[in-house]
């Protein structure tokens, strides 16, 4: 079986996912076109050597529908022979793309695959695609559906974390992201987005707040208390009977931001990279996905990480750096507690609380950020993990070469 290597990673800046966000006027295919062209240029890549493109998109409707992967390949004027597929594993879609690409390469069926994802949340809001999970009353009742924020607040209640704990984590995310941006740590991977006239739209992550304070966060109202009062708390408490009530601690300041963004990663075999004249940056050592309890929904990273670590023959302490998606503050907090991680090795450049979570792209962004930081610090191994809608987890372990 062939090894799968990472050859390059590019991403857009993340723009505020509202109509006044700097990337709102950029269509999803324009974001991808920007990245495909940048990857081709910086690698002097003969695109006819690429076998396939695998892209994640959580809301594949409107401009993001109809297999945007293939549309973007053609719009970027890559070789006509490069195929494309679009998929969704909810929030994990970007990392799932990388794992699917790695599996294709390891099987020997393909030698170079571009993986990644896109989400324009300002143009196509989360939930625009509907789905039986939330909208079919029979399914809803049978599965015990509750919004993710209810699950996040339930985790905080079960783990004994209050507002000061989750707010402190959120403040640290902004502080670390601000330092990383000031020190140009993201510059290797970030590709500025320009409009059709060549004018700059955005060249940095738009939502980082260096001034984020605990006092300001304390003034924010809980985001999910009203949803809980409408009946979702009762739904969750029917399964979690040791809890008398859910303490609603999450709000806009300690949850992931709604943003626009895209990311790509070139994955290939050693032979495929050599044919393209490229040197590998890292080897994809192991990957795993797993299902978890769907009402609380956000506890999947821990078992997914344990599954991936077992495949790699590693313990959590063998991993130098971790990227744990900050969907809500409690997700990395719980995963780190479960695995016994040193928080100085977790999300060292901030995360989705500070920079946002463009659903289909985030997993790819996390893995690329992880690789850049491993190289900057001259470290060896890293792991990226995300919680996933519907009660799932995903994890990928990489090793520099």
Where do the language-model regions lie?
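N-terminal amphipathic/basic leader segments beginning at the initiator methionine
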Residues: 1-17
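N-terminal extracellular/periplasmic Venus flytrap/periplasmic-binding protein-like
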Residues: 10-13, 24-25, 29-34, 42, ...
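Glycine-rich loop/linker segments at domain edges
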Residues: 12, 16-19, 103-159, 229
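Active-site pocket-shaping loop/turn-to-helix segments
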Residues: 14-41, 59-62, 85-99, 111, ...
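Conserved beta-ketoacyl condensing-enzyme motif
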Residues: 22-112, 118-134, 190-204, 295-296, ...
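Conserved catalytic cysteine-centered active-site region
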Residues: 26, 57-111, 142-150, 218-257, ...
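Active-site-proximal alpha-helical scaffold in enzymes
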Residues: 87-118, 156-186, 265-271, 336-337, ...
